[in-house]
Every structure is written in structure tokens, then in C-alpha cells.
């Protein structure tokens, strides 16, 4: 799918007519509800030699030793059978993350609606922390809303509890008297 290889920012005319920004070229299909195991496999690969950021871990995290032990106690057989991805492919993805200056992980409603969604998102946070991919441009966490209109609403500042300033501006601009209680 084109969107998996290059991104064009729809509000930047130069990007829309240009080539876009290269984002990925490795597609790894995962078993249903196998995301947590895949991310645990990535953590295992990253910790065992594919590249952590020790300075970032030391300065911005806590509990690394306990996490490292939990990861090392998770066997490859359990990981690969649960996620349905070969160890080699997980390690290939871990190497790509190691070589990336900035990694961002996006997910949508499917991931958040699994029985183990919280643990899966925590594991995503952990692998980004391992490489220092939080708090810098082009890196971090990116939960994507389930419907385009929901995301678009948030992008333009619409939410279920609009600020007093927004409501005042709406009233002054349109003459509409919006409700102020929510």
C-alpha cells in the first residue's frame, strides 16, 4: 500500500505534489491479538543487541532492570507462535528501528479494542523508550482515531468540552449562542 511507504502531508502543497517522505518498506502481518507478542519480541531483540539508548534509559526511565528481566524470561517460541511472525523478521524490524534516527509507532482502534490492549500499548511505549524515541521530532506515539471525521474534528480543534475562549469566538463570529455547560 502506498501509504505504508511514503507520506504526503495534505496541508503542505510542496509535499502533495512531491514524492513525500519515506516512512517504511517492511510489511509484517501479525496474528489477530498477536501484537503484544510482536512488540515483546522487538523488545527482546533490541535489548539483546539490536540497540538500546542507555543514556536515555538512565535519564528518563525507571524500572529498566525489572523490565529487562521480564523480557529475557519471555521465550522466542512463545513470542513467535503467538504473533505468527518468524524471529528473523522480528529481528529485521528491530534492526530497522536501531538504524532509525526517529521512530514513530501508530495504531488505530483495532489495537485498542483487544483484551490486552493496555499491555500492548505499554509495550509499544517500552520499545520506544529503549531507543530514546520519545520527546524528539519525528518520534513517539501516534494513536490514530477510528474515523476520519473524528480525527479531523480534533485536528481543527473541535472537542466535546470546548474552551470558554473558543465558545466566545464562535458566538462573536457567527452570532450563534452555543451552550456553555458540558
Predicted regions and their residues:
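Flexible, surface-exposed loop regions and adjacent strand-edge segments
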Residues: 157-162
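Cofactor-pocket helix-loop regions in the catalytic cores of large enzyme subunits
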Residues: 1-148, 156, 170-182
